[in-house]
Amino acid sequence: KALLANGLTEAGCMAHARRKFFDLHSQKQSLIAGEALDYFGKLYGVEREVVELDADERRRIRGAKARPIADELHAWLTRQRQVVPNGSGTARAIDYSLKRWGALTHYLSDGQVPIDNNWIENQIRPIALGRKNWLFAGSLRAGKRAAAIMSLVQSAKLNGHQPLAYLKNVLTRLPTQPASRVGELLPHRWQPQIPA
C-alpha cells in the first residue's frame, strides 16, 4: 500500500482470478464458474489477437474489444454475487475478482501491461522450486550469493545465452576486466569472447 501511495499503479493478474473459477468448475462442475470461464476465455482471445502488436495498438484494440467484455463480466459478477450464499466457494471466487477489479482491468488502459503475470511466474519458478533445497545454504552471505547467481542465470537465459557458457566466460574474464567496464559482462550486454 505504501508503494501505491507513492505513485505506483497496481496491475492485477487475470490468471489468478480465472484460476479461482477454474478450480471451482473442475471440482464441483459449477455452472456459474463455467460461465465465468467463458468470459475469461473471451478476454484471453483478445490477448491472442494483440500479443504481437506494439503497445499503442494493443491498448486501442483492448479498449475496443476487451473492455466491453470486461464490463459485461463485471456486471455479471455483481449480479451473481447477489444470489450466491456468503462463504460459498462461488462467493469467494466472485469476491476475489470484484475486490481487485481495478487492478485486474488496469491492462485494458495500458498496452505495456500484460493481462496476467504468468510469464514472470514462470521465470521465478526454478527459484521457488529450489527454495526448500536452499534453506541450508550455510549462512546468510551464502544465501545472498546463491540469489545473485540465480539472478544472473535467469537473466542469461532471458537474453538467449547458455547459462554455463555465459558463467564460464564471465568468470574467466572477470579478474582482468577493468572495474569501469564490468557492466559489459552483464547478461544484457555480454558478448562471448575469449579473454586475451
Model regions and ranges:
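Catalytic center-proximal scaffold of phosphoryl-transfer enzymes
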Residues: 1-196
